[in-house]
């Protein structure tokens, strides 16, 4: 007979064994384990679940012990019936995912479970069974004994559990600190590769539960179902990518019902999903949906712009599947739904710029990318708080500013009220004074009439003697009423000036300034007109002297500077025509700063310093500058420094390249600019034609930089469009622009000597033979620290094609620095010059009346390195012999030195040569008429060709009106082409192209609007031309 107790025990064991046979393979156990995974990692595990499993294990062990002659019962008793369950037991299950196994292996949890078998001596169970047959009363005593033993064991177990829990808490804290340090190091390493670098050090929590329930967003206002992901087998290999824990990532799998919902997605979403699937290793539609299903539903809420960015960025990734698994799936359950849409947009917009670099580092780094993304999105909360704090600070600042403005307005109102009261009091006082004056006048008149009457009566009654008459006249001298009124009015005015409020003067200033015009005159012809510039000049009150007019003591919205305005060393000096007083005005734009300077005959500089009080102090310094020049033995050298009385180049030089040190005060007005450089007034109109300072400061001679610094930084050569260095030179032709040299610190190098030397381009002067020599070599001082080198060159070796100038700077006998010019090409004659290739072009629409629609009158300004004014082609009559002789002479002159005076310009040279030819040809008039032939003097004037492809419009703009086609003459009316912005010259009505300087021309015509291809070329010169494209 089997005892009832054993039946109950075996029944319990069999039931537990049947449950144990299912093990951890059941889906229910999997769900329970994975749902409690997060609590297990943080020490908060479901004790009921573990107690049940441990009891099952205990019963299984007891059953095995009975089958093996009860060998394991002693082991259970020796362990005090405490079963320790650690993570390797759980990780033995084949159905657990590798990320759970890894965490469980590193974070084991021991839990004490009370055994169902009491601790008793050996064979205690047999003793109890034998007594059971004899007497049932013994059961109650055994049960009571077991209860006592169980209570004692429970107390011991509770104590042990408390100790173990304390130890576990300490271990967890240490492990959390270690994990936190590792995560911080990983976060710092990955900060450079985060889509948006966030500089917020936020504490990272431990690994959280990667929930198996994925909530899907709403699509077309329908709530989609929630699908659970079942983790595949551990041995399943995907594509060899790195997961968030460094292991192979597993494909999530959705139920088959999701495929039908996938078919209902929009076409744009499907196209993106198909692009992802083409670059992946999936073989079935189910696998495609399992990877992209959730991401596809997130895409339904994105805008078209975001979808386009996403679609375009997919084609540039070689491992889009890896990127998808690595970035989106691991942290998609951790990212809040409201941030995921913004995250996708920011991520792909950032990856489009740094796709290769960021994707490579993202896929190759064996770090926990989930924690990085999690910390990134947790920083959104901090960013929101920071933004809120910033907004609060801004609001507080605005409130403070508003309060300050309110207080200031109140103070101003109070001051105005006080001033008004004072004015009222002054007016009352004036009225009282006027009344008193009137009363006094009345009294005086009455007294005077009374005295006159008395005097008349006295004369009638008494005899008149000379003494009495004189005394009486002294006593009865009449009062001058007009003088009395004048004195009273002066006293009143003095009282008013003493008590006048401050704002009264400002009102006068504003009223006076309103009289100035508010806009630039519409007439493009600026000869004799003043310039009104609204953008580049302001007047700070600290720099205005007290002796200035009232309208200059306040910063107005417009600034009027008349035609006599002079710019000197970052200051604008104005000269009054009456007293020649100078007023300093600050010139804000350093790119437009200019000056006209001069030096007196004693080489002294008068520096005017303005202080805050408006007083001026003048200091005088004497500068000594020596310059030596090297010329050929056949030419006379000029060793003296020539001071240029005609102005300076300073308005074309930016402030950072100006000289530092003493400045020069102008002793007289100067209206002219140096030869070859535009005037400051003409420079001020270039922005109206569309020229920008950035373009004007580009290099003119393409063989060098725009600002060529010396080796040690002592000096700088200017090579811009406004101050160019010639790119080509001919025999003895003077360079009109020359070379402008700026010394950086004039005070330190006040006695510097500049020595220019010529070197051939082929560096063939090593043999000691000169290849080039200066025909003219003059260095003139514009102002202290700024020099202009005027030169002309003669070639001694015909094989040389170019040269450069080396400027050596000496302090005494020591060379302190040097600098080279760009390469300058050498031509036999100006007619051999290349066609203008690099041309800056600007235009304005003129107000000239035009009747046809789409046709406008346009005025152009063109700037290039060298624009040559050629001679107009003419027919001459001369004898054959003289023609041949003249041609031979011209060839000889062109091949070598020539007989042209270098002091004249190119036009004068050609005209003089032509006159000589004509005079020599005139001596053959006595010869037979048969010996006379007609010869053509081939000139090479400048011409401009405009071509509009769409309109098939073609127009040639010649240098002279005589070369215009008869059908195009109406496009060049005299009133249009004679208008010029050049204040130095009046334009001839026969000149269509007007040469303002050696590098700037202006011309005008009537043409239709369109996109033009413009060519600048010289007539009768067969060389390559480079067109420019211009829109009107």
Curated annotation (Swiss-Prot):
- Give start-end positions of Low complexity composition bias: 884-907
What segment(s) does the record annotate as region Disordered?
54-80, 391-451, 884-934
Q: Which domain of life is it from?
A: Eukaryota
Q: Which InterPro entries would you find in this protein's record?
A: Mediator_comp_sub12
PANTHER family listed in its UniProt record: C2H2-TYPE DOMAIN-CONTAINING PROTEIN-RELATED, MEDIATOR OF RNA POLYMERASE II TRANSCRIPTION SUBUNIT 12
Can you say what this protein is called? Uncharacterized protein DDB_G0289975
């Amino acid at each position: 007979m089997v005892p009832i107790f054993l039946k109950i025990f075996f029944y319990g064991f069999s039931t537990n064994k049947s449950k144990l046979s299912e093990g951890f393979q059941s889906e229910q156990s999997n769900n329970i384990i994975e749902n409690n995974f997060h609590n297990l990692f943080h020490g908060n595990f479901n004790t009921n679940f573990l107690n049940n499993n441990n009891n099952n294990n205990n019963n299984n062990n007891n059953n095995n012990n009975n089958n093996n002659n009860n060998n394991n019962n002693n082991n259970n008793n020796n362990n005090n019936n405490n079963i320790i369950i650690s993570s390797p037991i759980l990780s033995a299950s084949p159905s657990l995912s590798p990320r759970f196994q890894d965490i469980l292996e590193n974070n084991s949890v021991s839990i004490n479970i009370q055994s169902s078998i009491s601790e008793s001596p050996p064979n205690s169970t047999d003793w109890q069974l034998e007594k059971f047959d004899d007497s049932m009363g013994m059961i109650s005593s055994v049960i009571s004994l077991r209860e006592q033993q169980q209570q004692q064991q429970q107390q011991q177990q509770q104590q042990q559990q408390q100790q173990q829990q304390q130890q576990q808490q300490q271990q967890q804290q240490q492990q959390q600190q270690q994990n936190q340090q590792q995560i911080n190091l990983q976060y710092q390493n990955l900060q450079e590769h985060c889509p948006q670098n966030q500089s917020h050090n936020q504490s990272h929590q431990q690994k959280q539960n990667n929930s198996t329930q994925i909530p899907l967003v709403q699509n077309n206002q329908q709530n989609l179902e929630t699908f659970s992901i079942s983790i595949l087998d551990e041995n399943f290999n995907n594509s060899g990518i790195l997961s968030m824990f460094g292991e192979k990532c597993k494909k999530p799998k959705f139920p088959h019902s999701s495929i039908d919902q996938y078919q209902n997605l929009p076409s744009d979403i499907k196209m993106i999903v198909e692009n992802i699937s083409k670059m992946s290793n999936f073989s079935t539609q189910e696998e495609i949906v399992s990877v992209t299903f959730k991401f596809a539903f997130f895409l339904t809420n994105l805008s078209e712009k975001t979808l386009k960015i996403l679609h375009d960025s997919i084609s540039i990734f070689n491992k889009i599947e890896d990127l998808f698994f690595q970035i989106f799936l691991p942290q998609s359950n951790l990212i809040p739904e409201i941030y995921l849409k913004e995250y996708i947009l920011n991520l792909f917009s950032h990856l489009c710029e740094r796709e290769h670099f960021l994707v490579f580092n993202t896929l190759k780094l064996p770090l926990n990318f989930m924690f990085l993304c999690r910390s990134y999105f947790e920083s959104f909360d901090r960013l929101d708080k920071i933004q809120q704090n910033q907004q609060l600070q801004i609001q507080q600042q605005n409130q403070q500013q508003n309060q300050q403005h309110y207080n200031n307005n109140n103070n101003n109102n109070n001051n105005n009220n006080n001033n008004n009261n004072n004015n009222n009091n002054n007016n009352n006082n004036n009225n009282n004074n006027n009344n008193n004056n009137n009363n006094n006048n009345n009294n005086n008149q009455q007294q005077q009439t009374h005295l006159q009457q008395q005097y008349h009566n006295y004369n009638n009654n008494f005899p008149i003697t000379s003494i009495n008459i004189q005394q009486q006249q002294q006593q009865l001298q009449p009062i001058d009423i007009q003088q009395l009124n004048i004195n009273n009015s002066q006293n009143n005015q003095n009282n008013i000036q003493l008590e006048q409020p401050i704002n009264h003067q400002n009102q006068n200033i504003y009223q006076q300034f309103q009289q100035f015009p508010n806009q630039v005159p519409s007439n493009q012809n600026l000869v004799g007109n003043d310039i009104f510039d609204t953008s580049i000049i302001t007047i700070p009150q600290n720099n205005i002297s007290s002796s200035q007019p009232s309208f200059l003591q306040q910063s107005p919205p417009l600034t009027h500077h008349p035609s006599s305005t002079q710019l000197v060393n970052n200051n604008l000096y104005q000269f009054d025509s009456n007293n020649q007083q100078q007023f300093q005005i600050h010139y804000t734009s350093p790119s437009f700063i200019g000056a006209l300077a001069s030096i007196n005959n004693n080489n002294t500089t008068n520096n005017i310093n303005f202080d805050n009080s408006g007083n001026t102090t003048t200091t005088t310094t004497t500068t000594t500058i020596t310059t030596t020049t090297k010329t050929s033995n056949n030419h006379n050298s000029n060793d003296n420094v020539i001071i240029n009385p005609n102005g300076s180049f300073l308005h074309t030089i930016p402030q950072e390249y100006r000289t530092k040190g003493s400045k020069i005060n102008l002793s007289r007005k100067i209206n002219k600019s140096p030869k070859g450089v535009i005037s400051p007034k003409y420079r001020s109109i270039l922005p109206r034609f569309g020229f920008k300072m950035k373009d004007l400061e580009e290099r003119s001679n393409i063989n060098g930089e725009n600002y060529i610094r010396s080796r040690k930084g002592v000096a700088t050569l200017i090579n811009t469009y406004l101050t160019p260095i010639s790119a080509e030179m001919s025999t003895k032709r003077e360079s009109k622009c020359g070379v402008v040299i700026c010394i950086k610190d004039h005070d330190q190098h006040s006695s510097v000597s500049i020595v220019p030397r010529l070197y051939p381009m082929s560096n063939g002067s090593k043999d000691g033979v000169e290849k080039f020599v200066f025909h003219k070599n003059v260095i003139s001082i514009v102002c202290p620290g700024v020099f202009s080198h005027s030169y002309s060159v003669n070639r001694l070796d015909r094989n040389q094609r170019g040269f450069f100038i080396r400027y050596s700077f000496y302090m005494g006998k020591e060379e302190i620095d040097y600098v080279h010019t760009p390469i300058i090409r050498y031509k036999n004659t100006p007619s051999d010059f290349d066609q203008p290739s690099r041309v800056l072009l600007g235009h304005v629409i003129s107000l000239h009346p035009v009747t046809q629609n789409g046709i406008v009158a346009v005025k152009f300004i063109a700037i290039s390195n060298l624009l040559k004014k050629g001679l107009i082609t003419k027919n001459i009559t001369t004898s054959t012999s003289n023609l041949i002789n003249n041609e031979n002479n011209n060839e000889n002159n062109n091949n070598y030195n020539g007989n042209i005076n270098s002091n004249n310009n190119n036009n004068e040279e050609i005209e003089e040569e032509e006159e000589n030819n004509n005079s020599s040809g005139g001596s053959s008039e006595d010869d037979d008429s048969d010996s006379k032939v007609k010869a053509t003097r081939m000139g090479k004037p400048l011409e401009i060709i405009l071509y509009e492809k769409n309109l098939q419009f073609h127009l040639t703009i010649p240098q002279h009106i005589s070369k215009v086609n008869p059908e195009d003459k109406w496009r060049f009316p005299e009133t249009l082409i004679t208008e010029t912005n050049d204040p130095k010259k009046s334009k001839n009505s026969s000149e269509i192209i007007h040469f303002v300087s050696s590098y700037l021309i202006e011309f005008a015509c009537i043409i239709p609007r369109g996109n033009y291809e413009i060519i600048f070329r010289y007539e009768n010169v067969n060389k390559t031309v480079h067109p420019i494209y211009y829109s009107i």
